[in-house]
């Protein structure tokens, strides 16, 4: 696997212990890792401003993306082998140096944005889009769930065309991006970051997760 994009959910970023565990796993993986953070509590502030100041959906969309960058900076302090990247060219250059690229997504999305500018779009779709732009082998969405549940069990693999909504697992536009660009997306429990080692190596993983493909 040459390029792995990992989106770290905002809820996971609240815990220093969880961040440390994820960082330790990522630091030990082979080169080619790109991290996209969630907006978390900072995106919640934008939601509040959206209501109180009556800003437009477009304005809120880009403000929320800018809010993600606060977590980017925070993560860069936790990963010494990382570098903050605000362009696709910087990401590629950082990966060629064997470092972890932590994305500052605002400028990238401003320049190449095919996403609807609304609250229906979250950092999930932004991470998947960045993965598409980089030609990533896999995009992993680290969440606080084991994967997508169907009839009470985590589904190992799911076709994007077989479902219309991802509900609480990810924003629904992720499905559209998977269908349109044939990108592979895995939903993984961020409390079990060791799963990443199996995904990168291609070995059978004993832990549950869901791989969504076109």
Predicted feature locations:
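C-terminal catalytic "cap/lid" subdomain
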Residues: 1-214
